[in-house]
Swiss-Prot record:
Annotated keywords: Bacterial flagellum, Secreted
Gene expressing this chain: fliC
Subcellular location, principal: secreted
Identification of the protein by name: Flagellin
Secreted listed as a keyword: yes
Gene3D superfamilies in alphabetical order: 6.10.280.190, f41 fragment of flagellin, C-terminal domain, f41 fragment of flagellin, middle domain, f41 fragment of flagellin, N-terminal domain, Flagellar export chaperone, C-terminal domain
More about this protein: Individual Salmonella serotypes usually alternate between the production of 2 antigenic forms of flagella, termed phase 1 and phase 2, each specified by separate structural genes.
Family: Belongs to the bacterial flagellin family.
Organism expressing this protein natively: Salmonella montevideo
Cited function: Flagellin is the subunit protein which polymerizes to form the filaments of bacterial flagella.
Species lineage: Bacteria, Pseudomonadati, Pseudomonadota, Gammaproteobacteria, Enterobacterales
GO molecular function: structural molecule activity
Length: 505
């Protein structure tokens, strides 16, 4: 080996080894301080890509587990509401069993029906107000998908169903059955509306006290008075909803036949543009709500327009029937909010929207459809019959026969077979609850499986990117020793050129 001064090969070699040990020491210290074997892609490029995919799966599955727990919470919330609905149905069934006992008086049956009605209203309230995070869970049918996986399409569907009185088949449920109506039936009809209206027919004056629902006659000899809503329902919660009220006075004529006159106030309930049909003839309401006596109802008959004002109606025009429309301009009707149709069997049958008058002119039955509900008037019978829906009639005069029936099969079935109806409703609630219970078990299973998967993925990722402290501590110790040795050797290597100077002495 040549003896040179300019190039110290031993020093350069020592420095190179010292740099290597320094790099190893830095890497070991970085891994020990971070706990990771892979701190950047240069540490292990392939391992970093694999570990990153594991991280995506782990994070997605962890969130999916939380989603599944939310699904359990939704199912539990819904089932809790259904449990309350079930409790109310059980009470309704208990009351229905009590009502079928023949020892009950009319007062007992009314009390039972009142509690049943409250229970049914509570079922509707629970249905409308139960929600989870702003989502109503019983007010409509809904297929709610819960993401329980890290990839697209990995979902479990919760089948939320609408559960209320109507969907349970209990709309119009009545264990009290048909009964004769009295003035007492009117007293809660307009409980949320204040004020009264006074109408006159001839010499007689009538006043409807809307606040109490009572009907008052100002003359000494009260005639038969009907109070009805033109839209087929008396009950109203808002004075602004324009529910029309008609008063009908029925007296016995000299010829022994029943005569009816109407006191017009119902036209105030219509709104401009509303129409009604009679025997294919369409009437259009020209009056606006709150108009005076100049408000109009118009149609075209045989190519000629027929117009009536409120004042015309108030004079007591004749009832509408097929013959009237086909041969005369003398047309009378009450006005409603929306559309209605008469369905007369003969030309001579007479019918009004808000009341079906049973008299000598009625042959068989006349039928009227109001907002989708059908009612019939029959010349036979001597009682006012209520079945199912809200319909209040005051029948106080003698010698007049009126029969009003609701043509609703569901209501009749409920009244005839109350226990079967309740059992059917309970079965539906049980089916929904069973479905929710099964879905909760599915979520529990999914959560367990997700937990196992996340654990295994974490283990696999750890083997790739986590630092092995035993190995790294050993590497650090080795690097430290090499650093110390290298530093000492470098000092010796740097002294080699000094030895060359001895040759010059």
């Amino acid at each position: 080996m040549a003896q040179v001064i300019n190039t110290n090969s031993l020093s350069l070699l020592t420095q190179n080894n010292l740099n290597k040990s320094q790099s190893s020491l830095s890497s070991a210290i970085e891994r020990l301080s971070s706990g990771l074997r892979i701190n950047s892609a240069k540490d292990d490029a392939a391992g970093q890509a694999i570990a990153n995919r594991f991280t995506s799966n782990i994070k997605g599955l962890t969130q999916a587990s939380r989603n599944a727990n939310d699904g359990i919470s939704i199912a539990q919330t819904t089932e809790g509401a259904l449990n309350e609905i079930n409790n109310n149905l059980q009470r309704v069934r208990e009351l229905s069993v009590q009502a079928t006992n023949g020892t009950n008086s009319d007062s007992d049956l009314k009390s039972i029906q009142d509690e049943i009605q409250q229970r049914l209203e509570e079922i509707d309230r629970v249905s409308n107000q139960t929600q989870f995070n702003g989502v109503k869970v019983l007010s409509q049918d809904n297929q709610m998908k819960i993401q329980v996986g890290a990839n697209d399409g990995e979902t479990i569907t919760i089948d939320l169903q609408k559960i209320d009185v109507k969907s349970l088949g209990l709309d119009g449920f009545n264990v009290n059955g048909p009964k004769e109506a009295t003035v007492g039936d009117l007293k809660s009809s307009f409980k949320n509306v204040t004020g009264y209206d006074t109408y006159a027919a001839g010499a007689n004056k009538y006043r409807v006290d809307i606040n109490s629902g009572a009907v008052v006659t100002d003359d000494a000899a009260p005639d038969k008075v009907y109070v009805n809503a033109a839209n087929g329902q008396l009950t109203t919660d808002d004075a602004e909803n324009n529910t029309a009220v008609n008063l009908f006075k029925t007296t016995k004529s000299a010829a022994g036949t029943d005569e009816a006159k109407a006191i017009a106030g119902a036209i105030k309930g219509g709104k401009e543009g509303d129409t009604f049909d009679y025997k294919g003839v369409t009437f259009t309401i020209d009056t606006k709500t709150g108009d005076d006596g100049n408000g109009k109802v118009s149609t075209t008959i045989n190519g000629e327009k027929v117009t009536l004002t409120v004042a015309d109606i108030a004079t007591g025009a004749t009832d509408v029937n097929a013959a009237t429309l086909q041969s005369s301009k003398n047309v009378y009707t009450s006005v409603v909010n929306g559309q209605f149709t008469f369905d007369d069997k003969t030309k001579n049958e007479s019918a009004k929207l808000s009341d079906l008058e049973a008299n000598n002119a009625v042959k068989g039955e006349s039928k009227i459809t109001v907002n989708g509900a059908e009612y019939t008037a029959n010349a036979a019978g001597d009682k006012v019959t209520l079945a199912g829906k809200t319909m209040f009639i005051d029948k106080t005069a003698s010698g007049v026969s009126t029969l009003i029936n609701e043509d609703a099969a569901a209501a009749k079935k409920s009244t005839a077979n109350p226990l079967a109806s309740i059992d059917s409703a309970l079965s539906k609630v049980d089916a929904v609850r069973s479905s929710l219970g099964a879905i909760q078990n599915r979520f529990d299973s999914a959560i367990t499986n997700l937990g196992n998967t996340v654990t295994n993925l974490n283990s696999a990722r750890s083997r790739i990117e986590d630092a092995d402290y035993a190995t790294e501590v050993s590497n650090m110790s080795k690097a430290q020793i090499l650093q110390q040795a290298g530093t000492s050797v470098l000092a010796q290597a740097n002294q080699v050129p000094q030895n060359v100077l001895s040759l010059l002495r």
